[in-house]
Amino acid sequence: MGLDKACGVRNNARVANSSSTKLLPHTVVALVKDRPGVLQRVATCCGEKGFNIRSLAVGSSEQAGMSRMTFVVDASTDAEVMVAELKKLEDVSEISDISSQEFVSRELALVRVQGGKEARKRLLDIVDIFHAKIVDVAPDSMIIEVTGHENTIDSLVRLLKDYDVVELVRTGRVSMLRGA
């Protein structure tokens, strides 16, 4: 089915982020065909329906020729509308909103921080507290890697703001249902 039929047209889209609607993060996991244009079609469909993608991670899956996609959208209780529309795309094999179920969720961040010897000692203490790793050291900077729940990464980043954060990159959430 074409994108226009699956997602409608922009001026007919129902906007989920109207001021009268309380938005909640919804974690959606999909198994999609691993071919060019799939990510664009999924993102366009979400946008056409008025859903903002806050986080997105896509990578290889356990099935050859398929990718696993995890994305977080801001939505009210009508996230099922978006999931139903995405199911209509021929590239989407499986999709579900797992927000109401028990799931494991992780994110990775790399943070480049500048600092001399004195700052490094304090930074190493912070790295240890968060079970993070130093993955690169240069004369005036280091790169810290942290993996964990979104809140853990947010907390580490807040603490590092007291230092000279030169660069920050985050992967976005990856998630799996518990015990499935």
Across the structure, where does each feature detected by a protein language model lie?
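Long, contiguous binding/interaction regions
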Residues: 2-68, 72-180
